[in-house]
């Protein structure tokens, strides 16, 4: 005592005189230490602000502020390192000072009752912890220090065990200063379960001084990566009495030293892996060194103390008996000696101490200070341990006493931060454990009361799969804190079941570790058995049941019956015997029987909950099967029953309900069938139902319906209720369907089945008459199927049967025709080989009628229409024309007499000659010829009867295809028409073809007319619109061109111009002539197609079909244009009076007399009039005429005279068009004249300027429109107007017209240069290359100009 410093002497004296003065001394000392530590803490920051350079006048030297701003990190780092070194020195001094204080305070305390000390520590352990903690704490930075608890250390603080508390200093500053750890005032233990210390409660200022909690603790858990023990042996329970598990829970050992440590708040954020490794290494080394020395002392002490002394109130310094003090002293001394001996082996630097071995190095350094202290002061513990210290074995070599002077001031900083040995090891253990929450823990014990609670807060986060390894097994009635060195945790079956259910169940299940741990701890701790039993309720054992119940209650879509079954199941399942379950899992599946039971219950609950959906899926499958079966059953039995779907629905619902009730009555059936068959059946049905025929007949359905429901309980009441429910459902369904049928509605399911049947019907059956559609077998089948349901009323059955018969007849034959109509129309449009060029607008009435659809379907299938269909077509056509026309029209008679063997649409077959004796009736026969062979385009030359006026009135209203109009409007027809095909009913409809007479004269004239129209069709190849026209023989022998109106003037001018350009008219306008010449030159490639009438008629006859071939390439554009024109097409049957002989005087030459037959027949006269009318009607307008002009034409056609009113109207229209022509004439007159003079061809006699055509195209079109309309009016009875127009035309145009006619008819003007009659397709390539004047203008020059 003489060598101690003054403060220590004062403290020692005060402690000797009065133990109650210890708190006062401690308070003063702690205050000083706190001030010093705070100063050291602020020292780095104070040095940071020392850079206060005075301002210099030169701006270049003012760099200190900039340096501060630019180098704060480097300076702070330097200051931090300097402060760290100072802190380490302070910590070392503080540790030495604390060691002295603890050695002084210990011997002067009175002996206390040691009876309440549980789990006495071996003397070696006490001597091991203190020096380790002190030395380690002295070498650690200030940032790692912990709250001050060192003043309450054991009497031999340097002999305390440091390894049960990690010597890693806590990272943060001191947060608590424990001043209530004095000997006189016991501190109130603060033991939060979240941060409990692994040390037992300690009554001493220093950290847990008993080495046993860590020395004899279990080896590191599975997740604890620590170096193995050197002895590679585990400490058995007989070697130590306390356990310190690294999960942060308070161990079973209740050494009084550890209570204070438990009261210290745990500081998180300890060092990284280095601290962890060092903690684990100290833990293992301490366990190896201390338990070997203290096993005998520990066993002796345990034999003295009863189990009720397992708990001790913390803070009482006078409760230790002399025996306890002796034991503690022995333990501390032994530990210190062992540490001193190990310290001599390896003395590492400070850098080594910062490595994973820093804690061991600091422990050895601390042992040196303990040796020096024991050598100079001979310290003794304050429970009179000094007298037993001489019994301690081991070397007594002490370290250098200079440690007192070197570490005095370091002790202050260490006291400020607190000795980390107090709790750092426990914190390290917690840090290791928190990262691995699955590590097992031992249940803690409270220190102020008997332990009646088990640690369930931490254990709830533990993985349940680890419970199969390490249980707590030795917490017996004596509450001894022993844990088996080879723990075997045997989880309860419930824990295993819950664990597997949690992994495999689709429902959220609470952690099964909670109840399992409760049961385990309930077995270990007798005091907590009641609580465990209270918690071991069915809902606790099965935490998913309440959750499932809440989920089921919250599901609105879940049926009430399922909810009820779920409630019943959740209540009855816990009491079910296990033997009632049948294992549905594989036998080799590694689960316990309890787990199997849990899984089966869970699966059954899931099935109960989702069985409604499964039933609905099965019901939908049954419906799909029924719909798939209906076509086959309808063919076999006549018609599928509409009640099969409802019966199937009832069947599936019945099966689903049976399963539900069975599950409710017997919650634990054999689930193998449910799990195996239900999904397999569903998948098998999904794969096979399209090909599977539903094998449930009406009789089977009735038997299944009447058969009592299978039930394990055999409840008749339940069967009757279920049967009644199903019958009510069926009755309601049938009543609803019957009401719909009475109201004229069709049930949805019946409609679907009929649609399926109709889709399966062959198309060939669509031509059966409606009156014969209702098959008697189908009606019988319907009635029979209705009789199957015996619970239905007879009147209901009969009504349903009759309705089904009617509906079957109507739906089977009406709907397919209406559906097939647009389909066939679409196909006709897509298939070019079957599509025909449309020459007229469709008939709306015919298109909408079912007969028209049948005709169209028949045409698509290339089958001859039946007699009934022809009759229907005639009936539909008669709705839009006078009956007198139909009655007097031989065409309709011939159409009705048409044989079934109608020739197919062969484009290349030769035309059949008419019967003999029919040639004389040619004027009254419709002459049809085709210009495009591939598109079946036909043009008709028909005769018009005396009732042409009535016909014209009917034509604009009817708007049927051209051939139908011609058939309906031409009164006088020939009876030698060989084949009518079904008349078209849409835009793409087929057109009838009439054979052409084989008379040579007729053929010659026929081809001559064709030659006039053919170049107009060729303009389509140049992407120029076209107007179709029909040449009709008028009753008076004159010819009339029936132009078809187009949509715009641009598409009207070229075709109409070419069609109506006369040769004999010498008064055409200059612009009109230019446009005609340009169009003619464009069609130069069509010149060889100009038929020649010079040859014999027999040679001309085979030439006509090739003309059809030559027009193939023009089909696409022609079809498109014809579709545009048919909406506005209005046939004009214009009566043309025989004009004066002015045409003849002006050079118009018809066919020579040598080409006429010897006797001029009416046919020849009519042909002559045709050409006269064509050549005179040079400006007939192909565009749609105005309503006024149409009305005028119609009136003139009816009256067939030049009345004053008609002449006035025509004059007004002519004036309007003349004004338009005059405007365009002035604009293009000069260009046209220059153009004609420069490019006049010697043979053609008309210009071929390309650029002029493009630049003046618009003006020519306008001028042509005006002149064409005037010419039309002139030809219809305006001679004055015609004379005015002719006077205005230049003579040059007249000459060109004559030349053009000569070119067009070389046999007339140049009989010596006749061309041999060859087919145009074979001749035109040679002709195009023969003449040289065609090469300079291949696009616009044309020898054979058409109309």
Curated annotation (Swiss-Prot):
Give the protein's function: May play a role in spermatogenesis.
Which is a GO BP term held by this UniProt record? cell differentiation
Q: How does it sit in the membrane?
A: Single-pass membrane protein
Q: Biased-composition ranges for Basic and acidic residues?
A: 1108-1127, 1137-1146
Family annotation (PANTHER family): ACROSOME-SPECIFIC PROTEIN, SPERMATOGENESIS-ASSOCIATED PROTEIN 31A1-RELATED
The name on file for this protein is Spermatogenesis-associated protein 31A3
Record-stated family? Belongs to the SPATA31 family.
Q: One Pfam match, by short name? A: DUF4599
Q: Where is the composition biased (Polar residues)?
A: 165-178, 627-651, 927-948
| Residues annotated as signal peptide | none
- Regions of compositional bias (Pro residues) in chain numbering: 198-211
Q: Where is the composition biased (Basic residues)?
A: 60-82
Print the keywords alphabetically: Differentiation, Membrane, Spermatogenesis, Transmembrane, Transmembrane helix
Disordered as annotated region, ranges: 55-87, 108-142, 154-235, 373-397, 627-658, 900-955, 1084-1161, 1313-1335
Q: List the GO terms this entry assigns under cellular component, sorted alphabetically.
A: membrane
Query: Main location per UniProt?
Result: membrane
Name where it's found.
Membrane
Q: Where are the transmembrane segments?
A: 23-43
């Amino acid at each position: 005592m003489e060598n101690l410093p003054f403060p220590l002497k004062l403290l020692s004296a005060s402690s000797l005189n009065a133990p109650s003065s210890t708190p006062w001394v401690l308070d003063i000392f702690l205050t000083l230490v706190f001030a010093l530590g705070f100063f050291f803490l602020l020292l780095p920051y104070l040095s940071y602000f020392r850079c206060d350079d005075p301002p210099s006048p030169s701006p270049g030297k003012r760099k200190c502020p900039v340096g501060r701003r630019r180098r704060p990190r480097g300076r702070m780092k330097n200051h931090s390192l300097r402060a760290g070194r100072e802190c380490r020195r302070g910590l070392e001094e503080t540790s030495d000072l604390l060691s002295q204080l603890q050695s002084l305070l210990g011997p002067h305390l009175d002996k206390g009752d040691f009876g309440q000390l549980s789990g006495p520590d071996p003397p070696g352990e006490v001597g091991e912890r203190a020096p380790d903690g002190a030395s380690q704490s002295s070498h650690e930075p200030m940032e790692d220090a912990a709250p001050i608890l060192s003043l309450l250390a054991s009497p031999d603080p340097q002999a305390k065990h440091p390894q049960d508390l990690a010597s890693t200093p806590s990272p943060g500053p001191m947060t608590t200063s424990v001043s209530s750890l004095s000997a006189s005032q016991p501190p109130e233990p603060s033991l939060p379960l979240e941060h409990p210390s692994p040390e037992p409660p300690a009554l001493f200022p220093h950290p847990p001084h008993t080495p046993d909690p860590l020395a004899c603790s279990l080896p590191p858990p599975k997740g604890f990566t620590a170096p193995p023990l050197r002895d590679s042996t585990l400490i058995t329970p007989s070697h130590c009495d306390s356990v310190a598990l690294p999960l942060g829970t308070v161990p079973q050992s209740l050494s009084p030293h550890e209570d204070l440590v438990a009261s210290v708040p745990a500081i998180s954020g300890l060092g990284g892996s280095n601290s962890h490794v060092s903690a684990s290494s100290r833990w293992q080394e301490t366990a190896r060194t201390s338990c070997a020395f203290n096993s005998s002392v520990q066993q002796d002490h345990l034999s003295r103390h009863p189990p009720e002394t397992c708990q001790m109130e913390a803070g009482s310094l006078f409760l230790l008996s002399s025996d306890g003090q002796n034991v503690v002293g022995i333990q501390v001394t032994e530990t210190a000696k062992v540490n001193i001996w190990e310290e001599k082996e390896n003395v590492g630097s400070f850098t080594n101490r910062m490595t994973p071995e820093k804690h061991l190095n600091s422990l050895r350094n601390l042992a040196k200070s303990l040796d020096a202290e024991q050598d100079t002061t001979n310290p003794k513990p304050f429970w009179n341990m000094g007298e037993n210290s001489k019994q301690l074995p081991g070397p007594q070599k002490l370290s250098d006493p200079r440690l007192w002077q070197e570490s005095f001031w370091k002790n202050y900083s260490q006291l400020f931060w607190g000795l980390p040995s107090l709790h750092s090891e426990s914190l390290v253990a917690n840090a290791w454990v928190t990262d691995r929450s699955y590590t097992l823990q031992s249940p803690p014990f409270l220190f102020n009361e008997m332990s009646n609670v088990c640690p369930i807060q931490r254990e709830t986060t533990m993985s349940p799969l680890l419970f199969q390894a390490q249980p707590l097994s030795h917490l017996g009635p004596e509450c001894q804190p022993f844990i088996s060195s080879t723990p075997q945790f045997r989880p309860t079956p419930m824990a295993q079941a819950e664990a597997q259910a949690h992994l495999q169940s689709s429902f959220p299940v609470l952690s099964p570790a909670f109840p399992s741990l409760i049961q385990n701890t309930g077995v270990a701790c007798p005091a907590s058995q009641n609580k465990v039993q209270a918690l071991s309720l069915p809902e606790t054992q099965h935490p998913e049941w309440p959750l499932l119940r809440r989920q089921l209650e919250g599901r609105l879509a879940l049926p009430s019956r399922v909810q009820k079954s779920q409630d019943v199941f959740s209540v009855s399942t816990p009491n079910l015997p296990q033997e009632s379950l049948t294992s549905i899992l594989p036998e080799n599946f590694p689960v316990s029987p309890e787990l199997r039971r849990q899984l089966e219950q869970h699966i059954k609950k899931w099935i109960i909950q989702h069985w409604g959906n499964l039933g609905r899926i099965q019901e939908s499958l049954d419906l799909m099967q029924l719909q798939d079966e209906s076509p086959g059953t309808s063919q076999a039995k006549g018609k599928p029953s509409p009640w099969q779907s409802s019966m199937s629905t009832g069947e599936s619902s019945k099966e689903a309900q049976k399963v539900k009730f069975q599950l409710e009555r017997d919650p634990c059936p054999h689930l193998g069938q449910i799990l195996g068959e239900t999904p397999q059946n569903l998948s098998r049905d999904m794969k096979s139902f399209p090909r599977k025929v539903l094998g449930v007949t009406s009789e089977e359905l009735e038997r299944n319906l009447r058969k009592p429901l299978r039930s394990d309980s055999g409840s008749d009441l339940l069967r009757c209720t279920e049967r009644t429910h199903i019958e009510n459902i069926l009755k309601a369904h049938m009543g609803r369907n019957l009401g719909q049928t009475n109201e004229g509605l069709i049930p949805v399911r019946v409609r679907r089945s009929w649609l399926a049947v109709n889709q399966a019907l062959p198309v060939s059956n669509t031509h059966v008459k409606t009156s014969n559609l209702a098959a008697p077998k189908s009606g019988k089948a319907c009635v029979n199927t209705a009789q199957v349901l015996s619970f239905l009323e007879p009147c209901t059955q009969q009504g349903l049967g009759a309705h089904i018969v009617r509906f079957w007849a109507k739906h089977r034959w009406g709907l397919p025709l209406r559906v097939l109509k647009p389909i066939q129309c679409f196909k006709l449009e897509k298939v070019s080989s079957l599509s025909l060029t449309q020459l007229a607008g469709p008939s709306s009435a015919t298109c909408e009628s079912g007969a028209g659809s049948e005709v169209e379907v028949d045409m698509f299938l290339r089958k001859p229409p039946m007699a009934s269909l022809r009759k229907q077509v005639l009936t539909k056509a008669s709705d839009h024309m006078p009956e007198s026309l139909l009655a007097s029209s031989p065409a309709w008679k011939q159409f009705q007499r048409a044989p079934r063997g109608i020739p197919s649409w062969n484009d290349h077959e030769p035309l059949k000659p008419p019967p003999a004796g029919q040639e004389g009736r040619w004027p009254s026969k419709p002459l049809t010829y085709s210009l495009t062979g591939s598109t079946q385009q036909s043009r008709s030359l028909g005769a018009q009867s005396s009732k042409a006026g009535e016909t014209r009135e009917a034509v604009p209203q009817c708007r049927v295809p051209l051939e139908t109009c011609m058939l309906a409007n031409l009164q006088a027809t020939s009876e030698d028409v060989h084949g009518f095909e079904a008349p078209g009913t849409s835009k793409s409809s087929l057109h009838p073809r009439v054979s052409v007479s084989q008379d040579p004269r007729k053929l010659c004239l026929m081809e001559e007319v064709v030659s006039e129209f053919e170049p107009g069709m060729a303009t389509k190849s140049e992407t120029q619109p076209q107007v179709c026209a029909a040449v009709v023989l008028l009753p008076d022998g004159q010819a009339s061109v029936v132009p078809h109106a187009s949509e715009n003037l641009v598409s009207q001018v070229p075709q109409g111009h070419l069609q109506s350009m006369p040769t004999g008219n010498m008064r055409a306008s200059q612009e009109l002539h230019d446009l005609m010449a340009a169009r003619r030159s464009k069609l130069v490639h069509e010149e060889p197609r100009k038929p020649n009438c010079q040859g014999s008629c027999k040679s001309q006859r085979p030439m006509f079909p090739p003309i059809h071939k030559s027009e193939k390439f023009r089909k696409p554009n022609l079809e498109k244009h014809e579709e545009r024109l048919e909406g506005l097409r209005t046939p004009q049957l214009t009566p043309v009076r025989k004009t004066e002989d002015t045409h003849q005087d002006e050079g118009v030459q018809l066919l020579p007399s040598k080409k006429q037959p010897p006797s001029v027949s009416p046919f020849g006269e009519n042909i002559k009039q045709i050409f006269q009318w064509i050549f005179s009607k040079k400006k007939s307008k192909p565009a749609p005429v105005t309503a006024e002009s149409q009305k005028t034409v119609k009136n003139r056609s009816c009256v067939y005279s030049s009345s004053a009113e008609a002449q006035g109207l025509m004059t007004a229209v002519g004036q309007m068009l003349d004004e338009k022509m005059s405007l365009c004439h002035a604009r293009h007159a000069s260009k046209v004249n220059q153009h004609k003079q420069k490019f006049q061809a010697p043979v053609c006699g008309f210009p071929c300027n390309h650029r002029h055509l493009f630049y003046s195209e618009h003006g020519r079109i306008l001028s042509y429109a005006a002149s064409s309309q005037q010419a039309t009016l002139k030809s219809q009875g305006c001679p004055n107007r015609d004379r005015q127009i002719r006077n205005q035309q230049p003579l040059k145009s007249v000459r060109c017209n004559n030349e053009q006619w000569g070119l067009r008819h070389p046999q007339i003007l140049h009989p010596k240069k006749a061309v041999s009659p060859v087919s145009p397709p074979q001749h035109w390539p040679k002709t195009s290359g023969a003449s040289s004047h065609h090469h300079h203008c291949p696009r616009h020059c044309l020898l054979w100009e058409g109309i």
